[in-house]
């Protein structure tokens, strides 16, 4: 089951590192993290 942290659709880093976090958020976070 997907989850978001609190009411913010953008999970904080600690949540996005958690495989239980929302997959869309995790994908966006990883994409932003790979940018210079």
Swiss-Prot record:
Record has S-adenosyl-L-methionine as a keyword: no
Main location: secreted
Keyword Secreted among UniProt keywords: yes
Keywords in alphabetical order: Disulfide bond, Knottin, Secreted, Toxin
Compartments reported by the entry: Secreted
Cystine pairs: 5-16, 11-21, 15-25
Tissue specificity field: Expressed by the venom duct.
GO molecular function, one term: toxin activity
One GO CC term on file: extracellular region
Domain free text: The presence of a 'disulfide through disulfide knot' structurally defines this protein as a knottin. The cysteine framework is VI/VII (C-C-CC-C-C).
Protein name: Augerpeptide hhe6.4
Native species: Hastula hectica
Lineage summary: Eukaryota, Metazoa, Spiralia, Lophotrochozoa, Mollusca
